[in-house]
Amino acid sequence: MYLVDTNVLSEARRGRPEARDWLRSVDPDQVFLSVVTLGEIMKGISQKTRTDAAAAVSLHRWLEQLRVDHARRILPISDEVALEWGRIAAMRPQDMADALIAATAAVHRKTVVTRNVSDFKDLGVAVLDPWNLG
């Protein structure tokens, strides 16, 4: 089962074939999201609102559809995830969102699907890069 990073969802939305085709090839019931990913997307929408309100509205519709499509497969930050995040955060400096996604993947035994493999290297989670499947 897979925990999909924000960059894969964003690139699939933009029609990037690597991300789009990978998502289409996987059973939807095997695809999970972190609440952190929802927050990252909302941050982007909020920033976009300042420069392009119409694009922000479109992105917000997309976010709401993601929430509907993955309603039973959105993973929270539980106490177990928080404890795992603390362990991971002590390993090396890193982005808090990535560390929380890694902790979520570790606790729920999911493979992180991301283009940013180096962000998850040596954090104790399996990683899959749809841009480098060969």
Go through the PLM ranges and name each one.
Residues 12, 111-114:
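Short, hydrophobic beta-strand segments that form beta-sheet elements in well-ordered domains
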Residues 115-119:
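C-terminal structural segments of small proteins and small subunits
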Residues 11-17, 122:
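Short N-terminal helix/helix-N-cap motif within the alpha/beta-hydrolase-1
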Residues 2, 20-96, 100-111, 121-125, ...:
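PIN-domain endoribonuclease scaffold, especially VapC-family toxins
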